[in-house]
Amino acid sequence: MFFPLNYIKLSPHRNCLEKYLKKELPKLEGSILDIGSGGRRYDYLLKIKPEAIDTKPNEAKGIKFGDANDLQCKESSFDNILCIEVLEYVKTPQKAISEIFRVLRPAGTLILSVPLMYKTHEDFLRFTADYLKELFSGFSSLEIKPIGNFYTIILDILRGKIAKLKFKPVKYIFYLPYLFLVLFIPLSRLSKDTAYISGYLITAKK
C-alpha cells in the first residue's frame, strides 16, 4: 500500500527499492548471508534469520565483522546472499562478486542493489546496467531491474534539501508541498523511460 509519509522517513529511492524487496525477499528458501547488514533492516521480510556481517559489527544484534572482499566462509556454504546498497562502498567490486560467487551454492540466489543517480554518501563507485552485465557475467541467469525514475530523483533532491533546513517550523512547511508531489509517484511509474533512474536491483543465479 502507498503511504506518502514513508517518503519523509525514507528517501524516494529507498522506498522504491523496498517496494521490490518486499516482493522478492519472502520467496527465499534456505540459508541466507546478509552482507553489509547494518541494523538487520530486512530480517522481517525473511523466513529464516540470516547470518549477518558488516564492517561495523554489532554484538547486540548478532552482526559479525565481515569484509565483502574476503568472506570468511567455506565454498558453497549459502543458498542465498543479500547485498543491499553495499557494493558502491567496495573499492574492488570484481573481487567482492568473485567472493560472493564462491560462497554461494550451485543454483543459489544473489539479491543485490546499487544506487546510480543518488546523492554522494562516502561511496567509491556507481554502476551502469552495461557494467553490471559484465560484472555478473559468470552467473547462469541475471535480471537487472531499474529502480525509480526522473520524478523520484527530483523528489530525492527536494527531500535532501528540506532535511538540511535547521528551523523546524520552516522545514515542516516545505514538507507539505513535497508530500503533495509524492502523491503522484504511482502515476510516474507508468513511464517506461529508463534514461534517468536512481539505481538497480539485481537478481542473479549461480
Where are these regions (language model features)?
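Glycine-/small-residue-rich active-site loops that bind phosphorylated ligands and cofactors
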Residues: 70, 88, 120
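S-adenosyl-L-methionine-dependent methyltransferase catalytic module, highlighting the catalytic core
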Residues: 91-95, 99, 109-205
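A short beta-strand submotif of the Rossmann-like class I SAM-dependent methyltransferase core
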Residues: 83-86
